[in-house]
């Protein structure tokens, strides 16, 4: 079993806290952090080295760029970083664009916590 260090990038504090609480009972999660200021992203990646970044698509409250563009920037600077798109907008174009830029998956925000853990564990296994 892999212990997973997760970073959530989302502009909704209530969702971030809810996901943190929902995942807190799972032994697979070593750390769960969230940021709502994208200017902290580079420093966080360098200092904490998250295993997986869960990236919302719609970040209009914290960034002029959407999550796909931020994911693309992250992956160009940190090609080994695992990024998973997490969004309530389950559109095929987001899934295909995510694959094109190298994200490890797309997860709808309506997912059950145990299913999310299963997906993240599979991503960690390669």
PLM segments and residue spans:
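Acidic di-acidic motifs
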Residues: 10-11, 90
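Two-component/phosphorelay signaling modules centered on CheY-like receiver
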Residues: 13-33
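Active-site beta3 strand of CheY-like receiver
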Residues: 48-54, 59
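Short amphipathic alpha-helix used as the core "switch/output" element in two-component signaling
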Residues: 65-79
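C-terminal output helix
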Residues: 93, 111-121
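As written
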Residues: 98-104
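Conserved phosphoryl-transfer motifs of two-component systems
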Residues: 104-106, 122
